[in-house]
Amino acid sequence: MTVNPDYLVLLFTTTSGASGDKLGSDEKEIVQLVWQVVDLATKKAGQVNELLVKPDHIELSEECQELSGLTDEALTPVDPLEVAIDQLNQRLCAEVDTGAGNTFYLCTDGQLHVRQVLHPEASSKNILLPDCFFSFFDLRKEFKKEFPSEVKLKDLNLQVMADHLNVAVDSSLHAFTAYKVQQMVDIVLALISEPTCHEFTFPEKVNEKFETGTCSKMERVDDNTVIRARGLPWQSSDQDIARFFRGLNIAKGGAALCLNAQGRRNGEALVRFESEEHRDLALQRHKHHMGGRYIEVYKATGEDFLKIAGGTSNEVASFLSRENQIIVRMRGLPFNATAEQVLQFFSPACPVTDGSEGILFVRFPDGRPTGDAFVLFSCEEHAQNALKKHKDMLGKRYIELFKSTAAEVQQVLNKYSSAPLIPVAPSPILSVVAPPTFVPQTAAVPGVRDCVRLRGLPYDASIQDILVFLGEYGADIKTHGVHMVLNHQGRPSGEAFIQMRSAERAFLAAQRCHKRSMKERYVEVFACSAQEVNIVLMGGTLNRSGLSPPPCLSPPSYTFPHGAPVLPAGAVLPAGAVLPVESAGIYPSQFLLGPRPPPHTTTFYPASNTLYMNYTTYYPSPPGSPSNISYFPTGHTPSAGSVLSAQPTALIRMQGHAHSHAYNNGVKEILSMVQGYQPGNSDAFVTFPSMLSAKQPIGDQTVGGGAYLDLQLL
């Protein structure tokens, strides 16, 4: 938008912390506002003005005291930021005489003063900024328009611009902040004078609010405009994310909350900005706070954003086409719930936008309802009234309500109606599967708590950080015994399991290191055993009060086989994975979702434990970790999972025709008959070293007790 201002207000801010290119990066508060007005018509400047601001925490850095000359005592009697902003606006309106129709725009040295200082602090303190703070001129960009071949924009500063325009200001006559403002004024006067005759017509814009919208999977998203935010409170919405990045322009529909495999928020979000410049400013807010939590900010890619926010469903696009609507997610609906029942659930205090058209039920590809739905509300007030019905009853079920986003709608619909967001490893073809990769059972002692669990690690923590954290106990870690746990997006989950040389050292490490700090976060440390690691990775909880089994595990599955193996050396564990147990050793972890019938007879599937888990994905071992494939020391007895062999084998099937015969009491008889192993509940598959030895027991079709057996060569 083209403007023609009558006045420019050269504004300079000072915080209690860093200055220059680091201004605002440390989240410090404003302590000083200095400005000077320039009449663009007469090319004359007014007086230099100053307002001191009282921060909530008066603690000036040495850099601030040295440059500004301020002291803690000088800030004690002054007004806070909200009053200072109001005074600044009133004094500007009076000096410019806006009542007579005159207009003015702010002008700053770069983007930081407005985008990284004023707007973030005003947002965190719930201060409503005047309209003049949402449009401003960047003096560096205005200079670059006239001299495009000069220094790169990121290398520009006031001194470079002043030298090029032959502008000199006597620094001895002014304090530092007043000197900077005077320098800006002289640069502006030089730009608008001959021979340059520059016009200030295209100001920078600061978005007043975040706009929701949809994103197509076919859309092109620049990698240099996307960031990933971690550590978000689980109840945060896209509006909360926009508030955290206040001052920076987020693209329409550019805040996408990430969900885990169960459809719940995992504390991460992908944010798309309008330009690379705003993305770079967002990265400077790394470890800034949202409430009491600090948020980590990292670079991401356009592909990452499209995986989360992109959609192709026309139904979803139509539902989300109503802009500026508040979305509420319903979870736990009865499967036979109708739109009319949902409308009655919310009426009359919170009417749904467009009636039944404002309700979107989530369904499986075959049309079955999932129990989820999304509902539109026209304003924040209606949405808040709706959220008050959280856990109210609809039929015989209580309904969970959450504030949602357009990106979450896309993710949930993508999850249920199309391919999963996280690809599942293919079904096993055992003829090409490598031998088991776990450490032999002789390395693990059942029930011994010789492992340590770390919880609450910083997401960027490395193995070296963990060794430093454990201190003297780092020497007691087994070789390649540090195992980082990843979430379903392949990102660090903040947990790790460590194999110690003895239970005593694991106990001492847990006692001495519990709740020590690592990178500003305290870390919880618990001693545990390999069996307890199984439970935790399957969704159970482990703390100093004891172990709680996961709700997804059936009671008979709590019993672990004798000598359960420990973690593979150097393995990287996905959250939700299950450590291999004796009779399930050859199965990939995603195959342990439940018992399955024997597949095609050309492959061999031994009986498996009834193991249940929510979801898991594969992750490679970290670089440098030795491979343990085919590692079986001399004298090791193969487990049930090690039946795969490079030697040729033959199989026979034993099918009992006498219902009274039960194999749970007949294992020894079968072993004595065929010298085999691994019986099942009704059928048994037995492997032999050669075809000849497999044919011998077929001649005898009975076993002790008189039961007739059908022996077949496979």
Curated annotation (Swiss-Prot):
Pfam families: RRM_1. Transmembrane segments: none annotated. Residues 225-302, 326-406, 450-530 form the RRM domain. InterPro entries: ESRP (IPR050666), ESRP1_RRM1 (IPR034427), Exonuclease_RNaseT/DNA_pol3 (IPR013520), Nucleotide-bd_a/b_plait_sf (IPR012677), RBD_domain_sf (IPR035979), RNaseH-like_sf (IPR012337), RNaseH_sf (IPR036397), RRM_dom (IPR000504). The keyword RNA-binding applies. It is found in: Nucleus. GO terms for molecular function: mRNA binding. Keywords: mRNA processing, mRNA splicing, Nucleus, Repeat, RNA-binding. GO terms for cellular component: nucleoplasm; nucleus; ribonucleoprotein complex. CDD domains: RRM1_ESRP1, RRM3_ESRP1_ESRP2. GO terms for biological process: cranial skeletal system development; hard palate morphogenesis; mRNA processing; regulation of RNA splicing; RNA splicing. Belongs to the ESRP family. PANTHER family: HETEROGENEOUS NUCLEAR RIBONUCLEOPROTEIN-RELATED. mRNA splicing factor that regulates the formation of epithelial cell-specific isoforms. Specifically regulates the expression of FGFR2-IIIb, an epithelial cell-specific isoform of fgfr2. Acts by directly binding specific sequences in mRNAs. Binds the GU-rich sequence motifs in the ISE/ISS-3, a cis-element regulatory region present in the mRNA of fgfr2. This is Epithelial splicing regulatory protein 1. It comes from Danio rerio (Zebrafish). The lineage of its organism: Eukaryota, Metazoa, Chordata, Craniata, Vertebrata.
